[in-house]
Amino acid sequence: MNHPSLPPQSERRALAIAQAVYEAFEDYHARFSEITACAKQRFETRDWSGAREDAVARIALYDQYIAECMLRLRAVLLGQAHDRALWMRARDRYAALLSGLIDQELYKTFYNTLTRRYFGTHGVDADIEFIALDIEPTDAITVPVARHTYAVSPGRLTDMLVRVLGDYAFAVPYAHRTRCAAAIAVRLLDDLAHWGEHPVRSVELLETVFYRERRAYLVGRVFGEHRFSPCVIALINDDAGLRAEAVLTRRSDVAQLFSNSRSYFQADLSTVGDAVVFLRSLLTHKPVDELYTMLGRAKQGKTERYRTFFSHFQAHPSEQLVHADGTPGMVMVVFTLPSYPLVFKLIRDRFAYPKTMSRAQVEGKYELVFQLDRIGRLLDAQPYRFLRFPKARFSPALLQELQTSCAMSLSEDGDDVLIALCYVQRRLRPLNLYLREQLPEAAHAAALDYGQAIKDMARNNIFPGDMLLKNFGITRHQRAVFYDYDELCLITECNFRDWPTPATYEEQMAAEPWFHVGPRDVFPERFALFMGLPSSQLEAVKHQHPELFDPRWWRDLQSRLRDDDYPDTPPYAESRRLA
């Protein structure tokens, strides 16, 4: 959108603003790429603690470069930081600099973040921000992402895969490249046998290798005569050497690999939008916002999530926001739009007993989640500030509770409600409701996976704190995921104790502990009392996961974690591993 010209001095200043913001984003992108590129060496040298440090450092970059850009702009703005006409013109100048760029949406989000910092924007400001609720920006990306394509001659699949592994070389050699290629070939032929004779006609893999935790992934597609399927080759570098560990061709397996309950990939992509377009061809049901987020572009993920939600929200003007299903929380009020799979979580002004933490501590827990390896068990929770909703869109019961319980987060502006801070997550079915609704076999499997989820988190130094079923949800792929973080802490911070043996009848019958319990004391032998599982499912969990109730297991694990010895947690089922 072009606006009337400003005086020559202001025109020059608008251009200087645009150039400064452009250069700041370029600097951010270069540093982002620099950290991401370290993932290859971390993988080669098995420097897993360094990889975790890189992941945390990369998340912090965005706000660091926004702050640095604001410092640079001081010399340009000269007291005109809140001149709307100047920023409107700067936006036009900035848009001109982005013409033809594949990733111009990332640049625009950076610009929007700056204007929101300067103007304290509540909702959106269409005059100075880049707003496009009615379009899908990736639809305009037609440039194909960089990839390798391999044709397959009949009977020569293993030979082709030997070449693939050679093209993706590392500083450490494959333990046995031909054997790896043969195992991959067998799995592909088994998985795709229903495609008929000679099912694999070609394979297409992104040039960029994806890294996360202890694995590297070659991500692409396998083509038959009339169809294609995802093809992800997982590489591992451990005591047995560098080798292919798994091949994923099922969309459900690949979707779980890219789940928003996992940590972000380290993938050194020169451009991101074209990679998102490619990944959407593999995962057609995966929202664009989650793909951007999983590639480490969390701010862009937030932008796309906002864009798609409010586009849907405006297209359904008669639908009201209501309380989300599930047991009301003592720390959060949670609401949703029934037709859209997101929930919005607001911190209550006061917490019911026995919750004793402060509001700042709750916010700190949600920030901590970004720094952890979430290993498919912690749902991504993005913070949003100053969201604006029409007051009429809230159900009366929801609006009343927000006004009485979340007044610190809520304000009214005419016919609108402003939310100062909320956390937005994918909506899952709460586990306590799911177990009641399912047939016994499905409920049994979910209960066992709930136990596995607690173990997976523990092995990555995560203790949920509150193990009640209502704090877990079930994904589309029937996977138990934790999503309520107000009591989450690190395993290494806990004191795992044996439950004392009562010495007297009075102690044995006491309703409360007869001994001192410190704020970090945890008693695994008592977990069964706080899980809320029906007796048959509880017995199944005890049988399948007995270590959960053994304080010695927790103390041994704690000792390993303190020595930086993190057990491996593969992101796929044992059945997907190669022979």
From Swiss-Prot:
Keyword annotations from UniProtKB, A to Z: ATP-binding, Cytoplasm, Glyoxylate bypass, Hydrolase, Kinase, Nucleotide-binding, Protein phosphatase, Serine/threonine-protein kinase, Transferase, Tricarboxylic acid cycle
Enzyme Commission numbers on file: 2.7.11.5, 3.1.3.-
Residues at the active site: D380
Cytoplasm found in the keyword field: yes
Coiled-coil ranges per UniProt: none
Binding site for ATP: A324, D325, G326, T327, P328, G329, M330, K345
Catalytic activity annotation: L-seryl-[isocitrate dehydrogenase] + ATP = O-phospho-L-seryl-[isocitrate dehydrogenase] + ADP + H(+)
Alphabetical GO biological process terms: glucose metabolic process; glyoxylate cycle; tricarboxylic acid cycle
Pfam annotation, one family: AceK_regulatory
Subcellular location: Cytoplasm
A GO cellular component entry from the record: cytoplasm
Source species, domain of life: Bacteria
GO molecular function, one term: AMP binding
HAMAP family named among the record's database cross-references: AceK
Family note: Belongs to the AceK family.
Role description: Bifunctional enzyme which can phosphorylate or dephosphorylate isocitrate dehydrogenase (IDH) on a specific serine residue. This is a regulatory mechanism which enables bacteria to bypass the Krebs cycle via the glyoxylate shunt in response to the source of carbon. When bacteria are grown on glucose, IDH is fully active and unphosphorylated, but when grown on acetate or ethanol, the activity of IDH declines drastically concomitant with its phosphorylation.
Protein name: Isocitrate dehydrogenase kinase/phosphatase
Organism: Xanthomonas axonopodis pv. citri (strain 306)
Gene responsible for this protein: aceK
